Regions:
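A conserved short coil-to-beta-strand element within the FAD-binding core of flavoproteins
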Residues: 128-135
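Residue-level detector of alpha-helical segments with a strong bias toward transmembrane helices
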Residues: 23, 54-56, 133
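N-terminal Rossmann-like FAD-binding beta1-loop-alpha1 element of flavoenzymes
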Residues: 2-29
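Generic detector of bulky aromatic hydrophobic side chains
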Residues: 6-7, 21, 40-41, 85, ...
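Phosphate-coordination loops involved in phosphoryl transfer and adenosine-cofactor binding
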Residues: 1, 96, 129
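Conserved N-terminal/central alpha/beta ligand/cofactor-binding core
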Residues: 32-125
Length: 138
C-alpha cells in the first residue's frame, strides 16, 4: 500500500482523498483551515448546488466553449455518478429548476457531512491547520 498526501480539503481534495483511499492507498488529507469544505458552506447561498442533471451533451453544447478539454473527465465521472455517490453516502438530493441538484435539506453543511462520513469510512487521516506543508510534516 502506498502513501498518498492530498493537499486541500475542499470538494476536489476530499474527492481525491476518497478516490485514493478506495484504491487501496493510505491517505492523509491536509487542510489549512479549521474545518474541511469551508468555502463549500457558502455555495449556492448556503444550499450547495451539487451538480446538474442535464444530459452531458446538452451541458457541453450550452455551456462549454472548449468541449474537448473536459469531455473525457466529465464522462469518466459523470453527473449521475455524483448523485449516486451522495445518495450512497446518506445524502438525499432533489432536482430543481434548471436541473440543478441540491441536498433535500437545503444545507451545504449536509454535503460536507456526507463527504466526511465517507472519509472516515475510508480511514483517511485528516490534518487540519496544516498551512505549512513540507516533507517533515507528512
Amino acid at each position: 500500500m502506498s502513501r498518498v498526501v492530498v493537499i486541500g480539503g475542499g470538494p476536489a481534495g476530499m474527492f481525491a482523498a476518497i478516490a485514493a483511499a478506495e484504491n487501496g492507498h493510505h491517505v492523509t488529507l491536509l487542510e489549512k483551515n479549521e474545518k474541511l469544505g469551508k468555502k463549500l458552506f457558502i455555495t449556492g447561498k448556503g444550499r450547495c448546488n451539487i451538480t446538474n442533471s442535464s444530459d452531458m451533451d446538452v451541458l457541453f453544447n450550452s455551456v462549454m466553449t472548449n468541449r474537448k478539454f473536459l469531455y473525457s473527465a466529465f464522462y469518466a465521472y459523470d453527473n449521475q455518478m455524483v448523485i449516486d455517490f451522495f445518495e450512497q453516502a446518506g445524502l438525499p438530493v432533489k432536482n430543481e429548476r434548471g436541473n440543478r441538484i441540491f441536498p433535500v435539506s437545503d444545507h451545504s453543511s449536509d454535503v460536507i457531512a456526507a463527504l466526511q462520513r465517507v472519509l472516515k469510512k475510508d480511514q483517511v487521516e485528516i490534518r487540519l491547520h496544516s498551512e505549512e506543508i513540507g516533507r517533515a510534516h507528512v
